[in-house]
């Protein structure tokens, strides 16, 4: 799948599944219309991350959706993911691009216009901006005002995805402002029916 065709971007968090099978949740979300899956793991060993990444990659490959690894270039390369997402405190984008060449997508986090312009200049393929509605999955995430998000969208030419507390009830507030799409964690994974949640998100966003 091409980045420009993706509207719903799933960022994983096994805890958000609330006891449901992690891999089944991902597969159901993809069936509902998720176009990108980012595997985000902060507190597991490299070996466990690698093994988890292989399983998620297989699911993504079966459904022809993009597979992104959060932060870890080594894991992304080892499992031949489609790309890597880098936050402001991760490896510099220009260094990642030097290592990965043009074979991998590089996503970047930007919370204001200055950061957005900078990451675009450094070679990012897309931007994730938030937390637009606050979030329970990231402890240090500051809320991003809607006006600032709109400015970010108009300041760059690369696709922008909003993230942070987005669910089926508030996603409609983000349509028609120029976003490529939206990223969601618990707004998909914590729902009883992940497939239906994504279908509703798509319907309410379009």
What is the predicted function of each stretch?
Residues 74, 147, 183:
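Active-site phosphate/pyrophosphate-handling residues
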Residues 91-92, 135:
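A short, polar/charged loop-to-alpha-helix boundary motif
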């Amino acid at each position: 799948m091409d980045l420009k065709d993706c509207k719903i971007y799933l960022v994983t968090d096994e805890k958000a599944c609330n006891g449901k099978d992690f891999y089944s949740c991902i597969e159901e979300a993809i069936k509902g219309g998720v176009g990108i899956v980012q595997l985000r793991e902060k507190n597991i060993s490299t070996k466990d991350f690698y093994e988890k990444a292989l399983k998620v990659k297989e699911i993504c490959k079966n459904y022809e959706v993009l597979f992104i690894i959060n932060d870890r270039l080594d894991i992304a390369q080892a499992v031949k993911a489609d790309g890597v997402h880098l936050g402001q405190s991760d490896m510099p984008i220009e260094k990642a691009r030097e290592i990965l060449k043009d074979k991998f997508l590089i996503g970047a986090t930007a919370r204001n216009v200055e950061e957005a312009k900078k990451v675009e200049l450094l070679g990012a393929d897309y931007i994730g901006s938030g937390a637009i509605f606050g979030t329970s999955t990231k402890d240090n995430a500051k809320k991003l005002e809607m006006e600032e998000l709109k400015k970010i969208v108009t300041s760059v030419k690369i696709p922008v995805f909003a993230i942070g507390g987005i669910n089926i009830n508030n996603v409609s507030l983000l349509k028609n402002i120029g976003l490529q799409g939206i990223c969601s964690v618990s707004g998909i994974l914590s729902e009883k029916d992940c497939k239906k949640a994504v279908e509703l998100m798509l319907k309410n966003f379009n």
